[in-house]
Design a protein with these regions (language model features):
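Conserved, mostly hydrophobic/aromatic
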Residues: 32-34, 104, 137, 165, ...
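Glycine-enriched alpha-helix->loop->beta-strand junction motifs that scaffold or abut catalytic
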Residues: 98-102, 128-131, 152-162, 179-187, ...
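Active-site-adjacent beta->alpha loops and helix N-cap segments on the catalytic face
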Residues: 110-128, 142-146, 168-180, 195-197, ...
Length: 342
């Protein structure tokens, strides 16, 4: 595997968002057409190179190794719908993008908004989908006291359907304190994928749920290993994406099904892999939801869509430069991409 070969195989795309997500209106990604399949490199633009190198590692694993030999069973993966931090009046339109889905993740603690906004959004979701299970994601946006206050208010707004609060605070220590003080289960996301030690959440009994995202954890092999280890500490598992294109979603679906098939006795929650429905266009046609499920299968982008969604030249240069820097980090680290599954 050589850098020049990777760049020759790369396509940079810009996908317009139907609904803004964390302030993003266009999602950019670098896709790699490798000998074993397609990989994705799309760390958010504010991420530094050290953190972003794990995303490159995951993309190279998909493109150059592939995932043959993983038991996918019937391939059906239950997903959750995702509701960005929209006004309550916009909730119904977002929900319509997820027919048949029985679980929704709702963004809260958005900068510039208040707890009242969050309560209204969650109440609107519950009104339109009263039988749906709900989870909220604060992305570390609260203090401990704010999280404790919010937990009660949001549980009430959810009408008894709130299943967990994801990453209420930034630090693992704060998560542990919040978990001790509230009745709603706590999920860890950033405290796993952005941490030097992803197992600290288990050591401090800081979470009931582990959110596992393939790209920031460095690939399928690493993700399955971390998920298995955290499940051994009585944590349930939610496999999720980081606003991936269909390429990354395809890999996430494979991991979600692999977790379900290989970890007997582990509670596997509906996967956070439905965000493709927040795009206006993607590199393939949106996969049809069947019974609230998507099929686990690798994605092969459509050539016409790749061309139509190609990013402008200066953005291609930005992503190529970023890939080069992250490649240097991986190369210095040893450049090993052979990771066993499980």
């Amino acid at each position: 595997m050589e850098l020049a070969d990777i760049l020759d195989r790369a396509h940079v795309v810009a996908l317009p968002m139907a609904v803004p997500f964390r302030g993003i209106t266009t999602r950019e990604a670098l896709l790699i057409e490798g000998p074993a399949g397609w990989g994705e490199f799309a760390p958010f633009v504010e991420y530094g190179d050290e953190e972003s190198a794990a995303w490159l590692r995951a993309g190279l694993e998909a493109a150059y190794q592939g995932y043959q030999g993983i038991d996918l069973g019937d391939r059906a993966v239950r997903i959750n719908g995702t509701v960005p931090a929209v006004a309550a009046s916009e909730v119904e339109g977002v929900l319509e993008r997820f027919p048949g889905v029985g679980t929704f993740k709702i963004k809260v603690a958005e900068k510039g908004q208040t707890l009242i906004d969050d309560i209204s959004r969650i109440a609107a979701v519950h009104t339109h989908r009263p039988d749906a299970e709900l989870r909220v994601d604060a992305n570390g946006g609260w203090s401990v006291e704010e999280a404790v206050q919010a937990a009660t208010a949001l549980a009430d707004a959810a009408g008894g359907m709130l299943r967990y609060i994801e990453q209420p605070c930034k630090t693992v220590e704060e998560l542990a304190e919040v978990r001790r003080r509230i009745d709603v289960p706590v999920a860890a996301d950033e405290s796993i994928r952005k941490a030097a030690d992803p197992y600290r959440v288990a050591e401090l009994d800081a979470a009931d749920v582990a959110v596992a995202k393939v790209a920031p954890l460095g690939g399928v092999g690493n993700t399955l290993t971390i998920a298995k280890d955290l499940a051994a500490h009585n944590m349930s598992i939610t496999v999720a994406s980081a606003l991936d294109t269909a390429v990354g979603i395809g890999v996430g679906l494979i991991v979600a099904k692999a977790v379900e098939m290989s970890m007997v006795g582990v509670t596997v929650n509906a996967a956070g892999l439905g965000t493709q429905r927040l795009f206006v266009e993607d590199v393939v046609e949106k996969q049809e939801l069947r019974g609230g499920c998507l099929d686990a299968a690798p994605c092969v982008p459509d050539a016409d869509r790749l061309a139509a969604l190609a990013a402008p030249g200066e953005r291609k240069d930005f992503w190529f430069d970023r890939l080069r820097r992250c490649w240097d980090i991986l190369d210095v680290a040893g450049g090993s991409y052979d990771v066993p599954y499980g």
